[in-house]
Amino acid sequence: MAAPPRKVFVWEDGTPMRFYIRPGMAKLRLAPLLLAGGAGLCRVQEPGAVHLVQPGEPAPDGAVSTDYVVACVESQRRLPLDLYRHSGPAPLAASPRGRLPFTEAEDAALLRAVRERSGAPRVSGTALWKELECTGLTRHSWQAMRDRYLRHLRPLHRESQQTEEAAAPMGIFEAANREFESSESGSDTSDTPDELPLQNGEGTFPLEAASGLQTGLDDCALPAAQGENKQTNTFSDSSKAEEAAQIIQHFMEEFHTDLLTVTQALLKNSGEVEATSYYLHAGQRLDGYPVWSREDDLELQKDDEDVRSKLIAKFGAENVARRVAFRKS
């Protein structure tokens, strides 16, 4: 598919269109097209932003099909949104008690959200559920979501946690981290270690290579101490290696690069999927801050307020907080 022109996704007055799409493979596929076409991406739903949903996915009233992006790219112009706008889902039958039932997709979304926010306030409290209600995770109130999780879904969550392996063998992510931290890794022409299973004969990403790499496709909330609701799709301990393989394979194919380059790009961007995608596309971060280096990480480890203040000035407070969490993961 041809890359879109720079001004496809802009309004008549020249301002960029803003889009929101739930984290996942669709976002990975469409984000480079939207960004290259001049659009902006929202990490959470914002007033006035175009909410994109995949065909067949439950959609709120007014949401726009992801086919819109593809159609604009193919036609090389901005098309009317109304041609791709959903009128809203048909109402579901209520339960005998008069409540709207939870769907399997909503149950899965609740479980995933709790897994991704393992460091957030307790599930028995209210803060987590009010946050999820604000993000529009499901059609239900925060009270209904909390009740659904505590009464029906928590046993499934505990069972899933018990079946996770305590430790994973070293994979490509750890190998890239070792390369990233090496004092000799400043050159992009350094030899790839012989033991790294970079690609199989088909040129694809072997699943075994992702055994040490796990990723969360949903946005992970920043620590409550930050006092902000901004989110970022970062790599987390609760996700599966299959998702990591899909993401890395997608980047390798999208940007025609090798496995080590992709994993090092993820390291430099604190595991942020959207930031890594833009970095591989444009050679810089979308937010304008520099990428992290080994020297920056060494400075970050120092218990020195002056050093920390310099890092915040260089990377921004949010990026420093994400880097600290990423290095601990």
UniProtKB/Swiss-Prot annotation:
Enumerate the residue ranges of region (Disordered): 179-206
Q: Coiled coil where?
A: none
| Nucleus found in the keyword field | yes
Quote the cellular component terms of the Gene Ontology held in the record. chromosome, telomeric region; cytoplasm; nucleoplasm; nucleus; shelterin complex
Q: Subunit composition?
A: Homodimer. Component of the shelterin complex (telosome). Interacts with terf2; the interaction is direct.
Record's family?
Belongs to the RAP1 family.
Protein name listed in UniProt = Telomeric repeat-binding factor 2-interacting protein 1
